Design a protein with these regions (language model features):
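Ligand-binding pocket segment of bilobal, Venus flytrap-like solute-binding proteins
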Residues: 168-235
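Short helix-loop capping/hinge motifs at secondary-structure junctions, enriched
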Residues: 125-131, 150, 163-171, 250-258
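Short beta-strand->loop
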Residues: 29-31, 122-124, 142-169, 183-187, ...
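Bacterial N-terminal signal peptides
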Residues: 6-16
């Protein structure tokens, strides 16, 4: 009987030890431009996490930020989301109730471990002499930008353009609306994501200027044909804060909460902040940011909270069905 009891206890101990050292796979639903970033962060985090005796794999799903939010709402079992803007995670919280509405308060800097901004990528020599936002609406200038209804960069682009026009001498909401309407008349195709627009501009050869994430523009310069492009920083842009969050319901269902929370906290560590900077995202760590000051120049930045009343208001006003973008965008005209 004692031998049977010992075998049972040994089996139970082995089972528990196996469970404790079980492989963990996290699914990260992210936006298109972060492919390279999260591949590197996933590898780095896995090596760090392995020291605890567990093996972890980060699997990422990428697409337009708005489309990714809808996928999670519709059932994509993401443990974490790393999206382009807070409104998309707010939608997951309000529509699917997969995480609490106060999710932004759970991590530093409103749950945004890095920032970016919107810049212009032009062709070598800047043949159209594009230097600022007002140059984008000159006759003959073709602008490449993603679709604000599906992507994340696209909504930052739209708001940066709006803020520029509204803050111009004599500017107001009406002049900003007219400027943005004129701007989108110069956009021949609206890709579903910022990465899609990068491909349209650099691989398909369409357009005179690409409006996109700073990190996408810097990445383009590092490609084999990077010498065919140059970055133009406009006179002012916008502070883009891509947030991250635990998807509580999914993580609890899959038993991955501990690993998922550890991963999100890891994004704020010096090791991860360095990786983020090397991948052309502006780190929150000021010492690390200072090391990359030549990569990330200072420029005046609008903010969603100060200039648009926060993401809930901006989303409802500009990007919801029937909002300002739907009112002003007239494809083919």
């Amino acid at each position: 009987m004692k031998r049977i009891f010992s075998l049972v206890m040994a089996a139970a101990f082995f089972t528990a030890a196996t469970a404790q050292a079980a492989d963990v796979t996290l699914l990260n639903a992210s936006y298109d431009a972060t492919r390279e970033l999260y591949q590197t962060l996933g590898t780095s985090f896995a090596a760090r996490y392995a020291k605890s005796g567990d093996k972890i794999t980060l699997s990422s799903s990428h697409g337009g930020s708005g489309a990714q939010a809808r996928a999670v709402i519709d059932g994509l079992q993401a443990d974490v989301v790393t999206l382009a803007l807070a409104a998309d995670i707010d939608a997951i919280a309000s529509k699917a109730k997969l995480l609490p509405r106060d999710w932004q308060a759970r991590l530093p800097h409103n749950s945004a471990p890095y920032t970016s901004t919107i810049v212009f990528l032009v062709r070598k020599g800047n043949p159209k002499q594009i230097k600022d936002w007002n140059d984008l609406v000159k006759p003959g200038v073709q602008v490449i930008a993603p679709n604000p209804k599906t992507g994340g960069a696209s909504r930052w682009v739209y708001l940066a353009a709006w803020a520029y026009a509204e803050k111009a001498p004599g500017g107001n909401a009406n002049s900003a609306r007219a400027f943005v309407a004129d701007l989108y008349k110069h956009v021949p195709v609206l890709d579903s994501s910022g990465r899609g627009s990068s491909v349209t501009f650099t691989k398909r050869g369409l357009g005179d200027v690409l409006l996109n994430w700073e990190n996408e523009a810097l990445l383009a310069l590092k490609q084999p044909d990077g010498d065919q492009y140059q970055i133009v920083y406009p006179s002012r842009s916008i502070l883009a804060e891509p947030p991250v969050a635990l998807v509580d319901v999914n993580a609890d269902k899959r038993g991955t909460r501990k690993a998922a929370e550890a991963f999100l906290n890891y994004l704020y560590t010096p090791q991860a902040q360095e990786i983020e900077a090397r991948n052309f995202y502006r780190p929150r760590d000021q010492q690390i940011l200072a090391k990359y000051r030549k990569t990330f120049p200072n420029l005046p930045l609008a903010t969603v909270d100060a200039d648009f009343g926060g993401w809930a208001k901006a989303q409802a006003t500009h990007f919801a069905d029937g909002g300002v973008f739907d009112q002003i965008y007239q494809p083919g005209k």
